[in-house]
């Protein structure tokens, strides 16, 4: 056994390769795709994520025949080179709109939100769902389009720009079904012979219910969502608390009911549909939810992931061990271990350059981040990113570049071998931890269920007494401040 372990460590398997986000961000040619893929392979990079990215010319429109000419070439060549491919489900992010096509086909599928107003006057497309008397006034609750967008792949489609594609209503199962039809089914029709062999997964990226750049003062909502909220114990008075009184114990309880309703609806409408589609087509559902602490949604992923971005985790200012983002490594690895899933990953290094110079990122920096992930049990690495092109403005889009244009590319095989060795070692080893610190949302639901079943340990019985949940919230808030 030890000899096999030693052999696997010294000669790590290609299975554990880094799988970089490959930014397709310029005019593409088959010759250049081939050149870069051969360069990846030479440095021990045996897979990649095809990631259409800002800078892709309009002549190569997303999911057009021209676009698929290059996708087919890259996937076929990957098969010949014994490389693996992960498809990316959007252009560019967050996921769920098919570059705005979902909303173009049905405007009713645009992202929606809820706002509170003291005026009985609707904005365009809004529906009045409740009127609540509180604090001597009548408050009106309007459901309507959030105005949210995604970052697109062509210039003029970034945040705040006129061409930014509309985001879709991810809590509407019909909108998500259309997203799957437009995106996943199209990829399958074009590449079905590679599904389950060369193509190992599809990456969904931080789905955002409201979309980016949405109207201020809104919370996530969708059609018939009020019924979901009521099923979780919410009521019309709670609507006021969601906007105006979030800090009191009453407001916190309303917030918990709302979060549970969002979680159940989003799980059913978005994550479960995608997971079922991927399972039926022989590929892994991978990627990550919007927040670093969204451990519940990870149950739907074949390969649950999180992402290190913007130096939210970093060596300085105790960012490695404090705050919500410091939980992400254990969030993905413990989710996988708890549910018997062999791999879990991280999309890492995005916008993690030096604070004084976002382009500066050394191999030492890379190793710090890798070790931070490995010690927490992460065993699949998605480097962000290998840029197809750095021409003109492209080098300014979410640096640093950590691939063949980087200063350390000559020695990248060292990083590849290190990643393979550590990911291989972590994948089939057994975690010996005997104590779990449960996240706030999951813990609360488990406590409630144990109370209902009469199985609550004596030490926690106080939460069932008067003001018990207030003490529970005080306890979990202390955990929050510690980064658990």
Stretches found by the model and what they are:
Residues 1-7:
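Basic/polar N-terminal segments that are highly enriched at the extreme N-terminus
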Residues 24-25:
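Alpha-helical support elements that line or immediately flank enzyme active sites
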Residues 34-42:
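Extended, non-globular alpha-helical segments
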Residues 8, 12-19, 29-35, 47-48, ...:
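Carbohydrate-binding surfaces of carbohydrate-active enzymes
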Residues 182-186:
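A Trp-anchored, charged/polar loop motif used as the substrate-binding/catalytic surface
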Residues 51-177, 181, 192-193:
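Acidic/aromatic-lined carbohydrate-recognition and catalytic surfaces
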């Amino acid at each position: 056994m030890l000899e096999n372990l030693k052999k696997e460590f010294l000669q790590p398997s290609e299975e554990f390769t880094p799988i970089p986000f490959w930014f397709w961000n310029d005019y593409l040619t088959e010759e250049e795709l081939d050149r870069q893929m051969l360069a990846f392979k030479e440095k021990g990079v045996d897979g990649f994520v095809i990631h259409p990215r800002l800078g892709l010319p309009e002549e190569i429109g997303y999911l057009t025949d021209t676009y698929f000419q290059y996708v087919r070439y890259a996937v076929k060549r990957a098969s010949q080179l014994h490389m693996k491919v992960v498809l990316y489900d959007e252009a560019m992010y967050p996921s769920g709109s098919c570059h705005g096509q979902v909303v173009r086909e049905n405007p009713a599928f645009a992202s929606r939100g809820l706002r509170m107003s003291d005026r009985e006057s609707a904005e365009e497309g809004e529906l009045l769902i409740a009127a609540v008397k509180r604090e001597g006034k009548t408050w009106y609750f309007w459901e309507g389009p959030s105005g949210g967008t995604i970052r697109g792949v062509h210039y003029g489609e970034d945040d705040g720009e006129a061409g930014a594609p509309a985001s879709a209503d991810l809590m509407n199962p019909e909108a998500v079904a259309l997203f799957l039809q437009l995106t996943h089914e199209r990829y399958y029709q074009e590449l079905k012979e590679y599904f389950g062999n060369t193509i190992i997964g599809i990456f969904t990226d931080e789905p955002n219910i409201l979309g980016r750049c949405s109207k201020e003062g809104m919370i996530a909502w969708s059609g018939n969502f009020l019924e979901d909220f009521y099923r979780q114990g919410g009521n019309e008075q709670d609507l006021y608390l969601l906007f105006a009184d979030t800090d009191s114990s009453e407001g916190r309880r309303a917030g918990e009911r709302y979060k549970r309703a969002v979680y159940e609806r989003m799980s059913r409408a978005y994550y479960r549909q995608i997971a079922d589609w991927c399972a039926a087509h022989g590929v892994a559902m991978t990627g990550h939810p919007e927040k670093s602490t969204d451990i519940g949604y990870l149950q739907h992923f074949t390969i649950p992931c999180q992402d290190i971005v913007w130096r939210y985790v970093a060596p300085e200012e105790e960012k490695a061990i404090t705050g919500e983002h410091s939980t992400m490594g254990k969030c993905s690895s413990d989710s996988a271990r708890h549910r018997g899933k062999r791999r879990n990953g991280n999309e890492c290094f995005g916008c993690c350059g030096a604070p004084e110079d976002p382009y500066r990122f050394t191999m030492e920096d890379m190793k710090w981040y890798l070790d931070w992930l490995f010690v927490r049990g992460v065993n699949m690495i998605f480097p962000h990113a290998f840029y197809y092109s750095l021409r003109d403005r492209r080098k300014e889009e979410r640096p640093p570049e950590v691939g063949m244009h980087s200063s350390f590319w000559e020695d990248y095989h060292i990083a590849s071998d290190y990643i393979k060795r550590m990911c291989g070692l972590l994948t089939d080893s057994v975690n010996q931890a005997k104590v779990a610190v449960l996240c706030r949302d999951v813990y609360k639901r488990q406590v409630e269920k144990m109370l209902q079943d009469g199985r609550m340990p004596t030490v926690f019985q106080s939460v069932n007494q008067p003001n018990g949940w207030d003490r529970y919230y005080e306890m979990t808030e202390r955990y929050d401040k510690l980064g658990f």
